[in-house]
A protein has these predicted regions:
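A short, conserved structural fragment
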Residues: 284-296
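Accessory beta->alpha helical hairpin/"wing" motif in late/C-terminal subdomains of nucleic-acid enzymes
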Residues: 294-304
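Short amphipathic alpha-helical interaction segments
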Residues: 270-284
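Catalytic cores of DNA base-excision repair glycosylases
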Residues: 22-244, 252, 257, 266-273, ...
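Short, contiguous pre-domain boundary segments
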Residues: 1-13, 32-33, 230
Length: 305
């Protein structure tokens, strides 16, 4: 019989206490996605993967992550080059500001941590562009330190399992208390896989879910995941957006500086120079583009590649 919302709300309980860890871990071992970064415990490799996964589809990251690590196999190799080289390698993954932050983070790791990615969450979160989720993910997947990761998939599972909308703190507390001792890596990967494969956003496969007989929602009534903290909604259209123009310009600049006269064409808006200048201003503010004598360039490539 499914757990009622009242039963869940009445006690401070957790997935780990109410469901035998082996129950879910068995499903995880049989359904684990074959993702290349899961074979690595190298903190730098894991950090790169997690930064990429923040806002890029898993299949796209699986394609680009190995290539990025060939170019930048360790912290030192990333920190030692101009930002332009990291941005150029990142181009095509979207949200290119992440490349700037990753380059800055590599510099901080070299300067303050002797080139070693730190283990402590506070030190990880002090790195540029690294928030609580990414810090927890590095701890769990590289260092295998007791930590629970709550992305949109896990937040959705927790909301449905409890049958109610959760605040970010409630979701994180539930996840933190649920990690079986000594199984931090496999437990977190299993929850991520469950959310990606079975407890999906649009068409959850409740009949095949290993949590179905203990789930408060079980596909009946209003979905409690809607409106829960951490559960993402739909993205705004990419086609014709400022983001598309930003990406086009960064891709063009990977080949060298772009003159002011070519700016609008490079961004895909040949008839809208005002828009091009407005949007390039945001790229300059984000540290992705610099103004140079020949027009615009990636930082560090003002004189050409």
């Amino acid at each position: 019989m499914a757990t009622t919302v009242q039963e869940v709300a009445a006690v401070d309980t957790t997935i780990g206490q109410r469901i035998l860890p082996a129950d879910l871990l068995r499903w995880g071992s049989q359904n684990r996605r074959n993702l290349p970064w899961r074979d690595s415990r190298d903190p730098w490799a894991v950090l790169v993967a997690e930064v990429m996964l923040q806002q890029t589809r898993v299949d796209r990251v699986a394609e680009r992550w190995p290539r990025f690590l060939i170019r930048f196999p360790n912290v030192a190799s990333c920190a030692s080059v101009p930002p332009a080289e990291v941005i150029a390698e990142w181009s095509g993954l979207g949200y290119n500001r992440r490349a700037v932050y990753l380059h800055r983070a590599a510099g901080v790791v070299m300067a303050r941590h002797g080139g070693q990615i730190p283990t402590e969450r506070a030190e990880l979160e002090a790195l540029p562009g690294i928030g609580p989720y990414t810090a927890r993910a590095v701890r769990a997947f590289a260092h295998e330190v007791e930590a629970a990761v709550v992305d949109t998939n896990v937040a959705r599972i927790l909301a449905r399992w409890t049958g109610r909308r959760l605040t970010a703190r409630e979701a994180q507390n539930l996840a933190d208390q649920s990690v079986p001792s000594g199984r931090v890596w496999s437990w977190n990967q299993t929850l991520l896989d469950l959310g990606a494969l079975t407890c999906t956003a649009r068409v959850p496969d409740c009949k095949r879910c290993p949590l179905a007989d203990r789930c408060a929602w079980r596909g009946e009534g209003s979905d409690p995941a809607r409106g829960s903290a951490g559960v993402s909604g739909g993205q705004t259209p990419f086609e014709g957006s400022d983001r598309q123009g930003r990406g086009r310009l960064v891709a063009a600049l990977a080949g060298g500086p772009v003159t002011d006269g070519r700016l609008a064409d490079a961004m895909g808006w040949p008839e809208d120079a005002d828009r091009a200048h407005r949007v390039v201003g945001t790229l300059v503010a984000d540290g992705l583009v610099v103004v140079c004598a020949s027009g615009y360039a990636l930082p560090g490539w003002e004189s050409g590649t």
